Amino acid sequence: MAPSRYFDRRGFLRVAGASAAAAVSAGLIGACGEPLRDPEVPPLPDGLPPLDGRATSEFVPTDKATWRVQGNPLVAPTGDGPLAGLRVAVTDLYAVEGQQIGAGSGRRLADVPVETATAAAVARLLDSGAGVVGLAQTDDFGYGHSGVNLQFGTPANPEAGDRLPGGATSGAASAVAQGTADIGLGIDTTGSVRIPASYQGLFGFAPSRGAVSTEGLLPLSPTFDTPAWVCADLATLVAVSETLLPLRDEREFAAALSSDGINAVAEAGALRVVRDALSAWETSSLPRLTWTDTDIGQLPDWSEAVADVQGYEAWRLHGEWVAQALPSLSNEPRRNFVEAQRIWDSTYTRKMTLLAEASKTITTYIGDSVLVLPATSSPAPKRTGDPSGDRFRNTMRATGMLTCLATISGLPNATVPLRTGDGVPFGLCLVGPFGRDRDLLTLLKDLGDAGVLD
């Protein structure tokens, strides 16, 4: 593989992200503040040098809020396929041979061994020609949605410099938005790809649960965990998704569904953006949009049940270690773990029963259609707030009422970027029936052609 191909292929695919990349290179430091620097390591030149064939390198990152470790590449491609030349930021929750899983915790690195094998999803990307350029930061254990990490810093949100990046796929999403990676591989347990994609103006995809292997992924809540990914443009998202997803027969959706009741969970400014996009949908050649009269009275209970199940499982998996290291955790994950340890076995059993019934209701409601709704309840909150405080938590509760619809049934979902009237990123989410992942990809391509994203 010629070294120059590494960037030529990326430039060809990242069509829609070109203007964003230019804006980032022109003014990222001024907009988002000085990145954290190690005084012993000289700053890197702008951009990364071309890859030296399949040789690997490793260096201490200057932007420690985004990266735990970087390389050029850190892990070279093992094959030459449709992702040749693309750069992957792997969230530091995945096993990468020769590296530790830091999980956003500096203290954890002192206690865990070096991995001897690479996670299945990472290996698949490497096999298809992509190279890993670094392990990206995350909220501690992936148990947070703000992206704030007290040990390493908060990754930049290049599209909204005064706002949070969102988590838990915070570092990988920021790397993609900054243009230092083409693919951000993360985890979407209860919205950890949908939220940063919405906040940073990125495309995101979370597959049907079980469609992509979680082997080598540090679990948080096995009931909900799934690999997921973000990209700056639709062409790259489609290429990555087609690589990772299993082959299935494809067919069109019967219709598209939307609900004023569900949409109204979003705040007014975001709701206007959603309505404008749906108006454009109605006049396009996309699947017919049907408005449904939906009772949303159960959404708070469903969302709370998701949080309780996630918390119960997270504490059973990590509580013994976390109990010894609680003061080292960032505010949001620390509060989440403190609350998780109080969830009784009987509560978990009761909430799992509730979610089983909810899943039947959601699956019946969506049927053979695709549900269109806001990805989050608002654009990204300002960076000045406390992510463990009540205001942020109320925002996340509202977002949880939206994200739970796909989470509960393990449904495939895609996040596409829109903008509010004042130019702040905000995402639209499309949720498809279980197993219809590739049909959702086809609809995404049609969505771009129909002008709904303009």
Describe the predicted segments one by one:
Residues 88, 94, 242-312, 324, ...:
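Gly/Ser-rich, acidic/histidine-flanked active-site/gating loops
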Residues 13, 39-54, 58, 183, ...:
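Structural helix-boundary/capping segments
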Residues 85-108, 307-354, 417-424:
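Short helix-loop capping/hinge segments that flank enzyme active sites or metal/cofactor-binding pockets
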Residues 46-47, 91, 349-454:
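Glycine-rich, small-residue loops and helix-cap segments
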Residues 34-35, 39-181, 363-364:
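Gly/Ser-rich catalytic/binding loops embedded in alpha/beta enzyme cores
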Residues 9-17:
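N-terminal export leaders
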Residues 1-8, 22, 26:
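N-terminal secretory signal peptides
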Residues 30-31:
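C-terminal motif of bacterial Sec signal peptides marking the signal peptidase cleavage site
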